């Protein structure tokens, strides 16, 4: 992965202009053998100030706001007592919720200043293995925490959980993990009606 020349500057200016607790920009997926599509700029694109609830809603619906840490600049105080889970995949998921919950407001810009290089051997692209269920467990905990702390976002949280379960489920293509496949399919059946048409 790599960043644009304006990566930190844009995040810092957005945070300062908004008086926010953290700022977030966007990333571009760059595939092997393909050129970068976006053009870096120091102009803040589509600058927005988001409330805590609106920010969480965007994260849950994956509307331009992701759980990934590299596209964000946080005030250090948000991380007091928060640690990334050791030895787990997709460790950004639980941390993103905890720090967003503590923020009063966030700044968002559409600048694509982080370039996420896609290799066939990356965690996201590698064949299914049971360690990928860390993602499902994190998203289930996220859903339960949102239901407790922000009940008005319960259905959005269910939608995010369902999306994650489907993502992992569709990666299973062998009989070796049939038991896991069936368990994930039960989760899809449990949440699909409640999650679809949530807006």
Describe the predicted segments one by one.
Residues 1, 120, 146-150, 169-176:
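Secondary-structure edge/capping motif, primarily at the C-terminal ends of alpha-helices
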Residues 2-107, 117-130:
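Donor-binding/catalytic cores of nucleotide-activated saccharide
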Residues 112-146:
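Glycine- and acidic-residue-rich phosphate-binding/metal-coordinating active-site segment common to enzymes
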Residues 134, 152-160, 179:
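Residues within HEAT/ARM-like alpha-solenoid scaffolds
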Residues 137-156, 193-198:
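C-terminal, non-catalytic tails of nucleotide-sugar-dependent glycosyltransferases
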Residues 159-170:
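Amphipathic alpha-helical repeat scaffolds of TPR domains
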